[in-house]
Amino acid sequence: MSKIVKVIGREIIDSRGNPTVEAEVHLEGGFVGLAAAPSGASTGSREALELRDGDKSRFLGKGVLKAVAAVNGPIAQAVIGKDAKDQANIDKIMIDLDGTENKSQFGANAILAVSLAAAKAAAASKGMPLYEHIAELNGTPGKFSMPLPMMNIINGGEHADNNVDIQEFMIQPVGAKTLKEAVRIGSEVFHHLAKVLKAKGLNTAVGDEGGYAPNLGSNAEALAVIAEAVKAAGYELGKDVTLAMDCAASEFYKDGKYVLAGEGNKAFTSEEFTHFLEDLTKQYPIVSIEDGLDESDWAGFKYQTEVLGDKIQLVGDDLFVTNTKILKEGIEKGVANSILIKFNQIGSLTETLAAIKMAKDAGYTAVISHRSGETEDATIADLAVGTAAGQIKTGSMSRSDRVAKYNQLIRIEEALGDRAPFNGLKEVKGQ
């Protein structure tokens, strides 16, 4: 009943209006899985390759017809007749057939779309929700938890057209008892933030991930306006709501210095920028910082981990790119204490699960994440619950491409009830 009989690839549009790959996997019992690959803006240099056509006459060169052709051609031929329930085998077949280190032959966007569609079809054939199937693939059947959301309510850096250097300023509704309550708190703070910004004469247009993207006097001012919004919403900062940041520091690392253009081109060494961040953590209840230095600055990251690693969660995104080889090196060297998990950085479900397992086995936390270019596909919600990862980063409280994930989490929590606890701040490293 779970043998693959047909695979279809197509070019669809993501939340930024760019093409991406969608795949359908059909099984002999009539079961179908449908999945789409997301796409990043601030990408790590060691990510698996997202294959684009480069034909400037279509979609400004961003078409994905080559990747779609790979799905409809060699990938389909290789996986038809195989058992979709054997995820590791499906993924291995595609990776081996691609034959490159970074999936550049077919594109990680092609391989991932088929990988996720196969998992969805297999779950349907087993008559179970995707999160339950993922828990079985993960070797943790029946073990679930609802993730603490990191909600990106002020966007800067590569995600917005403003003067804020740090890419994401996030809230975590740690005072919530359930995921559904966390979403409500996030929504209320989000709306109060709009009022705070408007009162200051600031822009309330939103960035790629649904957060506001105002021009501010400094990066610290983003934290100040969020603190004001939390209070206005009737919550206590540090008790009901904590803060998190994604610096995406690789984006402002120039000639060995960290240059904050939005603050008059202030330049910092690795140590100085670490202490700049440390000062912010003393002023505000920041419990998690992602990519606080450049992805290649391992000596700096080691220092940052020594200074901040026992106090807060230090998440490697561009640093680790969901890659077990790089994560292993980070664990051995004592660099960071958490990994951001993005399917499309590595390009298959099997490799994603391996990265989560490696992190957890080493005492690192794993934060499941969207990309800035998303679709209505909400698979990361099921991934977060099915691996009991504990944390999720899927944008703000606007744009359907973000909200789709929160809504799926609400549905899953309703279905699982007490079987999926919401552990809040306990999930965050160092808290």
From Swiss-Prot:
InterPro entries recorded for this chain? Enolase, Enolase-like_C_sf, Enolase-like_N, Enolase_C, Enolase_CS, Enolase_N
Please tell me which top-level EC class this enzyme sits in.
Answer: lyase
Entry's EC annotation: 4.2.1.11
Give me the comment on cofactor binding: Binds a second Mg(2+) ion via substrate during catalysis.
A Pfam family (short name) is Enolase_N
Residues where (2R)-2-phosphoglycerate binds: 167, 342, 371-372, 393
Catalysed reactions, semicolon-separated:
(2R)-2-phosphoglycerate = phosphoenolpyruvate + H2O
Q: Which UniProt keywords apply?
A: Cytoplasm, Glycolysis, Lyase, Magnesium, Metal-binding, Secreted
Obligatory cofactor(s):
Mg(2+)
Write down the PROSITE patterns for this protein, in alphabetical order.
ENOLASE
Q: In which pathway does it act?
A: Carbohydrate degradation; glycolysis; pyruvate from D-glyceraldehyde 3-phosphate: step 4/5
Q: Which GO terms fall under biological process for this protein?
A: glycolytic process
Q: Which SUPFAM superfamilies match?
A: Enolase C-terminal domain-like, Enolase N-terminal domain-like
Q: Which family does it belong to?
A: Belongs to the enolase family.
Q: What is this protein called?
A: Enolase
Naturally occurring in which organism (per UniProt): Yersinia pseudotuberculosis serotype I (strain IP32953)
